[in-house]
């Protein structure tokens, strides 16, 4: 994949939290790395009545106030902001899309753009089904030029709504031009799972039901929902974390090696894992799924007391479940998945529990040896930790465990920002790390 000569990145929801906290900081890093197309501009769209100048001033103030910019980024901030433009419009009002069309035509000669547009939907999900149609009806999807679209989660509320969205997007875009973003796939440690597996003769031969006892996938936080009550009460932990982030981690852990690591090879193997999941019948759910909700404690309010949450809400803030991948490699191996808010710690990790040796020749001073563990830490302190058996120093032959720990931070290696990687891929037209549609 290669960058086009010219491209407009059109961001709907340009005055929102996602754009301010995630997209703009990531775009500055891409700008400083000189990884934009030769002629590139960002056009922010939202209802707020900014001009180019006032929007740039707003972004500058917010980015400096965040304290996230490096010294180099502070020095190049004005140069980056010179590529940013703004069009005041209402993404929910079809009549305002003509304003966007006119603005893009006005900017096209300056940037030698012949209709290459990448649309980013950083908006509430209720607009996801409206924007593609409004873009089409306003003539913004006409040839010539490439037309791509990036959609944030959640992509639908349930199966029926996801199917409806897929039909809408398929009517206006090719599947290869639809980028359903899951920022977990942009994380360096998540991508490293595949390298650790398929690039190693140590792990891949034993990465199966014969040697692995069970797998744990955990993503928990030690804080509540904050100011997200309006969104979260309509979603919950299952929709917010399990059906996207944690299922992606499960798929990458369980997938077969692709014949070729490209957009089709990787995503097709991910789909095969989903197709192999044991069906979640009512009986299975009763026996293998736990849902919960955090309550008030000494130093915190309960979920139902959070702002914009219904006082009788039954929305889950904690989910734990046991899943099975019914195929040759994983038959009978349980995958334990859990996520929750207001937990004792904040961590996202995958733990591979290997089976102990068939005969325990050596004993531990206390308890039983349960087997080795491979821990893939996604956040915080990204890295890989291996717990292996060792002899306890001293008389006798007592077993103990030793930890071999690799951390990116300890080796002065920056893992980079997930949005940087995914935005770079979308600019270059590489959908490998984006979700492929499985439902129609």
State where each predicted segment sits.
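Secretory/organelle targeting and membrane-embedding segments
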Residues: 1-151, 155-438
